Design a protein with these regions (language model features):
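A short beta-turn/loop motif at secondary-structure boundaries
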Residues: 36-39, 167
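A conditional alpha-helix N-cap/helix-loop micro-motif detector
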Residues: 28, 95-99, 128
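Short gly/ser/thr-rich secondary-structure transition/capping motifs
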Residues: 25-33, 155-159
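Non-catalytic C-terminal accessory region of glycerolipid acyltransferases
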Residues: 2-12, 100-220
Length: 220
């Protein structure tokens, strides 16, 4: 992050990507499909299903570009606070309209970076069944395309050594989908327009998840 503003930096996210690669490929066996669908340059939003704590680190280690994730403020405790900030991650208060987080997230996209979002707002079934409007807002406001991402296999079994993690060296599938625009081309940013965009986005995300399950043979 930049000392003056606290904004995340690409350099920090690049360090985070290196750590993610080392950890995820060292502990598990990620199988990455469709990573070429992530634009090689320019702003993009990765919309990731979220059913396990490793989903964020897994994306940091498997995405083809450094990612700045919006992460709940509760994760920024003790030494994790400066660490997460240092690797370019964004702290967000989910209980209110966090204008600092919004500004930093739009700044990432404005600088042509990659913003990672868990559109359900919290960890759950990971099925995109309940989306918050934040994803559509960032996409419509910035004009950045959305790339849906399905992380599958992280909750199928529990590890013997660490029950909170999948078994060591187990396969986790990460499937990137086709990029798409959230807006309808009208340029509207009204609440109604965002609600309509959220419905469209949800349809694309659930469709990608179903396709990813068929492709990988996963049922979770």
């Amino acid at each position: 992050m930049t000392p003056a503003t606290g904004a995340p930096t690409l350099r920090g996210a690049a360090v985070g990507r290196g750590i993610g690669i080392g950890l995820m490929y060292g502990l598990f066996k990620p199988r990455v499909l469709g990573a070429w669908r992530v634009p090689a340059s320019g702003p993009v939003i990765l919309a990731v299903n979220h059913s396990h704590n490793i989903d964020g680190p897994m994306l940091m280690g498997t995405a083809p570009r450094p990612v700045h994730f919006l992460i709940k403020k509760e994760a920024f405790v003790g030494p994790l606070d400066p660490f997460l900030r240092g690797i370019g991650q964004l702290k967000v208060d989910r209980t209110t309209v966090d204008r600092t987080a919004i500004t930093h997230a739009l700044g990432v996209l404005g600088d042509g970076g990659v913003l990672g979002i868990f559109p359900e707002g919290t960890r759950g079934e990971g099925d995109f069944a309940s989306l918050r409007a934040g994803l559509a807002y960032f996409a419509v406001r910035s004009g950045a395309p959305i790339v849906p991402v399905a992380v599958l296999g992280s909750t199928e079994r529990r590890g013997r050594l660490i029950s909170a993690l999948p078994p060591l060296r187990s396969r986790v599938d990460v499937v990137f989908g086709e990029a798409f625009d959230a807006g309808d081309g009208s340029g509207r940013r009204t609440r109604k327009a965002l609600d309509e965009a959220t419905v469209r986005v949800q349809g694309r995300l659930t469709g990608h998840l179903e396709q990813a399950r068929r492709l990988t043979g996963r049922t979770e």
